[in-house]
């Protein structure tokens, strides 16, 4: 447990951030660019799409991107049609609010990704295969994003998660080969990310806030 019993702990630390750093938009843009933009960002687990043709739309991105299992493996790609920017996978034309489904299989659309608006059709790796009534198929493929797979955990970004977390991934509890994905929960929280990390990194709150874990 953290040693907080000494009065010196209550003095202002030299490294304490100014209050404005939690609210300044320019600071936030720098954080997104220099911290998150240069990190390995967790996207999801490969068990979200266990079979070829399976897709999973990223709800925390409002279905703007999706994981798709192709013959080459798991792909992360844009889920927005290049023609009129419609959401494709997960779009329910019979639902009053449109895109609602989170996952499925492409066998429902002949093994391809098909836009519900004008039927533009893309392959499982995002290549545009056809555009109805166009004399030639435009060169307008879906944007794809490189993924790094570590024990089934999928990351995007320039850093190598296997190198950053080598000791962590060597532990037996990170072997998910015999697991089956049950469900995914998404919690959207309205607070500064630094506040969450600061609380997460101290264990003073564990006893009263997480009974049984202290």
Regions found by a protein language model. Give the residues of each.
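A structural signal for well-ordered alpha-helical segments within the folded catalytic domains
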Residues: 25, 62, 191-194
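Peripheral, non-cofactor segments flanking catalytic/redox cores
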Residues: 1-7, 29, 211-214
């Amino acid at each position: 447990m953290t040693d907080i019993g000494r009065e010196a702990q209550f003095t202002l630390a030299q490294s304490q951030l100014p209050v404005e750093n939690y609210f300044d938009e320019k600071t936030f843009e720098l954080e997104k660019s220099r911290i998150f933009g240069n990190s390995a960002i967790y996207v999801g687990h490969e068990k979200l799409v266990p079979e070829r043709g399976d897709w999973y739309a990223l709800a925390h991105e409002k279905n703007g991107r999706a994981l798709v299992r192709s013959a080459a493996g798991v792909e992360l790609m844009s889920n927005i049609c290049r023609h009129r920017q419609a959401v494709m996978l997960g779009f329910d034309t019979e639902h009053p609010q449109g895109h609602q489904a989170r996952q499925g299989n492409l066998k429902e659309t002949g093994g391809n990704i098909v836009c519900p608006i004008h039927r533009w059709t893309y392959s499982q790796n995002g290549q545009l295969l056809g555009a109805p009534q166009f004399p030639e198929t435009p060169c307008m493929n879906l944007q794809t994003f490189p993924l790094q797979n570590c024990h089934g955990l999928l990351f995007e970004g320039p850093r190598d998660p296997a190198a950053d977390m080598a000791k962590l991934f060597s532990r037996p509890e990170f072997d998910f080969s015999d697991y089956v994905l049950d469900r995914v929960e998404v919690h959207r929280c309205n607070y500064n990310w630094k506040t969450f990390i600061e609380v997460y990194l101290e264990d003073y709150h564990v006893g009263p806030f997480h009974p049984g874990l202290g």
